[in-house]
Design a protein with these regions (language model features):
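Accessory DNA-binding and partner-docking regions appended to nucleic-acid-acting proteins
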Residues: 75-77, 109-114, 127
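Domain-level recognition of nuclease-like catalytic cores that cleave nucleotide substrates
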Residues: 124-145
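Mg2+/Mn2+-dependent nuclease catalytic core
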Residues: 101-121
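Switch/connector loops and helix/strand junctions flanking conserved nucleotide-binding motifs
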Residues: 91, 104-106, 141-145
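Hydrophobic, Leu/Ile/Phe/Ala-enriched alpha-helical segments that form helix-helix packing faces
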Residues: 63-67, 115-126
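Accessory nucleic acid-recognition modules appended to NTPase machines
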Residues: 1-79
Length: 145
């Protein structure tokens, strides 16, 4: 699969990243295969950390799939997990940080402020005046009452 930063064209950018789309095959090549000879010597905590890192990328993919047109965005020292047309505002943009764990209210607020700071350094800022910032965490997986 070819990843492009949000708003970039295949024809005009060299900022292309290629990655395996299927999560199971990606797990094999990014997590298990590189460590196969040492896998049995890893502690449970080391294996859990590797699996957690993989699960976080799968969760980011899941979150991007929830919003039509959503992509990652990166430039220089700025990386945004999710950038998409805002479903609630046709002229706006949704910019979100994605975390594969449940966050407290304080953590969510701190991450939102950090996201806004990163947005201030982003060149997309000049093209989009109306932006909604959000933090998506594992709580979105809970069924709603």
């Amino acid at each position: 699969m070819r990843d492009l930063p949000f708003g970039e064209s295949v024809r005009s950018t060299k900022k292309t990243l290629c990655r395996i789309q299927d999560p199971t095959i990606r797990f094999w090549f990014r997590v298990y295969s590189p460590h196969r000879s040492r896998w049995t010597t890893f502690s449970v905590a080391e294996r859990q950390a590797l699996v957690h890192d993989h699960a976080s990328t799968v969760f980011e993919d899941y979150c991007r799939a929830r919003f039509p047109g959503a992509e990652r965005y990166w430039e220089g020292r700025v990386e945004l997990d999710l950038v998409a047309p805002d479903p609630d505002d046709p002229k706006g943009l949704l910019v979100a940080e994605v975390k594969w764990r449940q966050l407290s209210v304080v953590e969510r607020d701190a991450m939102r402020r950090n996201l806004e700071t990163r947005w201030e350094r982003c060149s997309l800022r000049a093209q989009y005046r109306r932006v909604r910032f959000d933090v998506l965490d594992a709580s979105i997986l809970r069924p709603r009452p």
